[in-house]
């Protein structure tokens, strides 16, 4: 489910704030986001802004056409043709988009890391810890039933984004899906703590390229390698479960929902094409 909505999540900010305005002022938005964690110097902002402009040009010319191609494929999918295998193919393609973007920005992450002072590193780690604590607070003291309720609300919201209001049979599947999921909230809390430690070690090695780059590569491209055996097992189970239930829900789509999906895909395609102009 997570990778199926990668494209939607990555573009949601653009739509909410005015697509072209955000895209053509992306450097400002990225800097503003980073400064939620650490204040940058004027020189750091200038360098980062220049790099983001270059990346945006690459993204517009090289990547957006690939997104449009995938949306065209999605528009051809019907409830009758949807299968777990087809779903998986779309996931793999979306993940490839994400990895290409990571590969493009990796040198700039290294460049920015080298410019950080020791105090900025400390501030960044504290900001990361604050964010992780907010996640932990959302689940503090919740029962398993309440957590499954959160899962249900999240699943329902994301599915309805693409299909519109669900039918009773689909709502029942969503309930079964959420109730069947293995709870990972506390495993993610532990994982976040480990990642925070890894990021701190990474940044403390920012002047040692031979140590920094392999660790950065692992964090960017192999985050699953930091999963505990228990979390890895739960994630694999929940992913397979999500694929199965989502396909069943799609297969039950009526004409209204099919049209809703087609409209969503068409809207995203228009957004992407507009960004290229």
Could you say what each language-model-derived stretch is?
Residues 34, 48, 102-116, 124, ...:
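Short, structured motif recognition centered on aromatic/hydrophobic residues
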Residues 18-20:
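Bacterial signal peptide processing site
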Residues 65-103:
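Mid-chain, structured segments of secreted extracytoplasmic proteins
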Residues 22-70, 74:
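Start-of-domain marker
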Residues 196, 200-277:
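A cross-kingdom marker for long, charged
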Residues 1-4:
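Positively charged n-region of N-terminal signal peptides that target proteins for export
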Residues 110-228:
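Extended amphipathic alpha-helical interaction segments
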Residues 14-16:
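C-terminal motif of bacterial Sec signal peptides marking the signal peptidase cleavage site
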């Amino acid at each position: 489910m997570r990778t199926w909505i990668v494209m939607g999540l990555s573009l949601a900010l653009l739509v909410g704030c005015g697509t072209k305005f955000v895209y053509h002022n992306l450097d400002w938005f990225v800097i503003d986001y980073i400064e939620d964690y650490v204040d940058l110097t004027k020189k750091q902002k200038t360098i980062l802004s220049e790099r983001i402009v270059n990346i945006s040009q690459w993204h517009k010319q090289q990547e957006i056409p690939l997104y449009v191609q995938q949306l065209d494929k999605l528009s051809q999918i019907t409830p009758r043709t949807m299968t777990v295998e087809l779903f998986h193919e779309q996931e793999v393609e979306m993940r490839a988009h994400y990895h290409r973007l990571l590969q493009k920005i990796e040198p700039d992450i290294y460049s920015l890391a080298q410019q950080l002072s020791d105090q900025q590193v400390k501030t960044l780690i504290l900001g990361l810890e604050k964010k992780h604590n907010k996640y932990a607070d959302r689940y503090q003291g919740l029962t398993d039933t309440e957590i499954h309720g959160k899962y249900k609300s999240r699943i329902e919201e994301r599915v309805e984004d693409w299909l519109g209001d669900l039918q009773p049979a689909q709502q029942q599947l969503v309930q079964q899906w959420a109730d069947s999921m293995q709870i990972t909230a506390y495993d993610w809390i532990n994982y976040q703590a480990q990642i925070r430690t890894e990021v701190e070690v990474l940044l403390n090695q920012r002047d040692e390229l031979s140590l920094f780059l392999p660790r950065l590569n692992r964090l960017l491209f192999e985050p699953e390698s930091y999963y505990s055996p228990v979390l890895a097992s739960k994630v694999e189970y929940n992913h397979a479960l999500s694929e199965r239930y989502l396909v069943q829900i799609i297969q039950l789509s009526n004409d209204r929902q099919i049209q809703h999906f087609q409209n969503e895909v068409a809207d995203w395609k228009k957004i992407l094409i507009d960004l290229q102009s």
